[in-house]
């Protein structure tokens, strides 16, 4: 141990869990190694990790309640794209293993694109089951956005295997479904399962709009994802509509 350099100590600590690294560095510190700053760093990491675990446990409160009532497969459901002027609405349903936490999960709107992309892969990998449904702008114009959203959610749920026996939703109640439903206001911030669904829906939709950007570059879909930004409205007034615009949403911007 006496010949270890600080770089070697850092490399060894990086191989360990945060708690193991603290124990390793504490042992070195007690034998005279100057690792105070490195030890402080790992204590800060531990505090950050503990706060994150506490946040995630709070986000499992609705799931724990459902488990206590005897439900086994609890699905979180959410959508992306109710408000944009163009493109589809996308819904996702996710059943996670009971008690599972995934660090960083939150309402998709509170995450960066890179965070969402990373979590998208991790959620799909760790979920017991998930479903994703895309409902296009033509159907939205035909039945209105609320009904299109409900159809997307119902279709996403129908893809689950095993089937959910309890559904947590972000402030929506679905029609003609006998499964227990728990609508939660601001559910994507309060339920881990709904937050996971919000990430799957958001990433799926964002990727689609990026593809549309290559097809219709004059509108800037990759930047605003179809929402009514000044850039988007200006492009509509200049170039008119393209096939993915929602006619029922853009009446105020076209003559």
UniProtKB/Swiss-Prot annotation:
It catalyses: Endonucleolytic cleavage to 5'-phosphomonoester. Its main location: cytoplasm. Its cofactor is Mn(2+); Mg(2+). Gene3D superfamilies: Ribonuclease H-like superfamily/Ribonuclease H. One of its GO terms (molecular function) is RNA binding. InterPro entries: RNase_HII, RNase_HII/HIII, RNase_HII/HIII_dom, RNaseH-like_sf, RNaseH_sf. This is Ribonuclease HII. It comes from Ruminiclostridium cellulolyticum (strain ATCC 35319 / DSM 5812 / JCM 6584 / H10). The gene is rnhB.
């Amino acid at each position: 141990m006496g010949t270890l350099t600080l770089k070697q100590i850092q490399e060894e600590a990086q191989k360990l869990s945060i708690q193991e690294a603290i124990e390793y560095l504490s042992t070195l510190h007690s034998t005279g190694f100057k690792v105070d700053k490195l030890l402080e760093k790992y204590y800060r990491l531990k505090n950050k990790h503990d706060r994150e675990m506490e946040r995630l446990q709070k986000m499992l409160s609705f799931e724990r309640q459902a488990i206590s009532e005897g439900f086994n497969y609890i699905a979180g459901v959410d959508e992306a794209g109710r408000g944009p002027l163009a493109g589809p609405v996308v819904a996702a349903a996710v059943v996670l293993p009971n008690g599972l936490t995934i660090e960083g999960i939150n309402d998709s709107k509170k995450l960066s694109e890179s965070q969402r992309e990373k979590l998208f892969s991790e959620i799909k990998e760790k979920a017991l089951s998930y479903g994703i449904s895309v409902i296009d702008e033509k159907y939205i114009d035909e039945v209105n956005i609320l009904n299109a959203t409900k159809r997307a959610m119902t279709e996403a749920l129908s893809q689950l295997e095993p089937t959910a026996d309890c559904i947590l939703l972000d402030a929506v109640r679905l029609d003609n479904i006998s499964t227990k439903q728990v609508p939660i206001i601001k559910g994507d911030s309060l339920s881990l399962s709904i937050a996971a669904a919000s990430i799957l829906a958001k990433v799926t939709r964002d990727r689609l709009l990026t593809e549309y950007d290559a097809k219709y570059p004059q509108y800037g879909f990759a930047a605003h994802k179809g929402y009514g930004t000044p850039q988007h409205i200006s492009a509509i007034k200049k170039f008119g509509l393209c096939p993915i615009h929602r006619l029922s949403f853009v009446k105020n911007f076209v003559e």
